[in-house]
Amino acid sequence: MKNMKIVMMAFIAALGLLSFTKPSHDNTLQKESISSKKGYEVGDEATDFKLKNIDGKMVSLSDFKSAKGFIVIFTCNHCPYAKKYEDRIIELDKKYKAQGYPVIAINPNDPNVQPEDGYQQMIERAKQKGFTFPYLVDEGQKIYPQYGATKTPHVFVLQKENGKNIVKYIGAIDNNYDNPNDVSEYYAQDAVNALIKGEPVKMTKTVAIGCTVKVKK
């Protein structure tokens, strides 16, 4: 009986050891997965892409030979936050395109998850609102994870440096999605203005407020 108790205690201890070590392995895998989806940080080089525009043509950052940088905005059709910002995004492009910082809008959502964000709907929305900038579709959802975009809208201000597109600002367009008249902090504008003046960007990162990116399950 004594030997049986010893065997049982050893068995229980072994089970406890297994239950203790397995979560540690799972947690490590989880952290690696999160890290792999982290995306760009300020100071990183943003790699170029080639995505389809609403006119059917393929667009890359390298197509904009005279650009000094870019205001890359991940946005979409259906999201109430994105809709609130549409007019402001148009104004950003009108204000800064001539100064070398055009807006490049990218729809990261899977249309099978959110049909309102389909390609044809993008064409119709751009025409309705009078978009003055490229509105690209992230087919296969390969670009938004590289950037680390998690919301629509989510802004990445880039500056050309020695032939590379360097991330200078990440986050929200401003600090009031609901009413442009109540905005007190113009994050994206301030970042671009600083770059135009040759000054460092003071606020390099803010929290993007919007709808989550709709990913195919």
Q: Where are the predicted features?
A:
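Short active-site neighborhood of thiol/selenol oxidoreductases, capturing the structured segment around
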Residues: 62-83, 192
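Second-shell loop/turn segments in exported
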Residues: 77-78, 108-113, 177-181
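Structural microenvironment flanking redox-active thiols in thiol-disulfide oxidoreductases
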Residues: 83-128, 139-146
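Thiol-/selenol-based redox modules, centered on thioredoxin-like
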Residues: 157-217
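Loop/turn elements at helix/coil->beta-strand transitions in domains of secreted/extracellular proteins
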Residues: 67-70, 98-103, 129-134, 152
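N-terminal "domain-start" segment that seeds a small globular fold
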Residues: 27-62
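Short, internal strand/loop/helix patches
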Residues: 123-164
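Bacterial Sec-dependent N-terminal signal peptides
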Residues: 1-32
